[in-house]
Amino acid sequence: RERGLTLIEILVVFGILALLMGLAPVAFDRLRESSQYRDTVRTMLSQMRSARQRAVTEGQEVRFFVNLRQRSYGMDGDAPRVLPDSLTVRTVVAGIDLTGEREASIRFLPTGGSTGGSIEVQRAPGVGTRLRVDWLSGRVTLEALMQ
């Protein structure tokens, strides 16, 4: 028998390659969504901690906001960042649950405290993180959402 591949072997290889190429976009989308989620949570956490530090250092109130209508967030004095479409955001400030049309804000005070509140960032139902701001200390902590 001569060395080489039969037609069936070549077709099997092409079939496997086609299957892998069909799965690649799905895997890429999941990877992109996961990356956007981690980046958004990390940036929110960093900006909230910076807002607290700036309030204490400069001796004046600094506001961190989430605009639910425009799907953006940020702190006073910085350009707002856009929330990716793949993420769902829910905020609770001053005991009021805001999920729709309004802008929520947490104010960091020169004393180190804040008005308190929490921001939940979800990438899929039940998968997410809550950024909680303690009203007394102004400390920002992360909690996994359990549903």
Predicted region positions:
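N-terminal helix-rich module
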Residues: 1, 11, 19, 23-57, ...
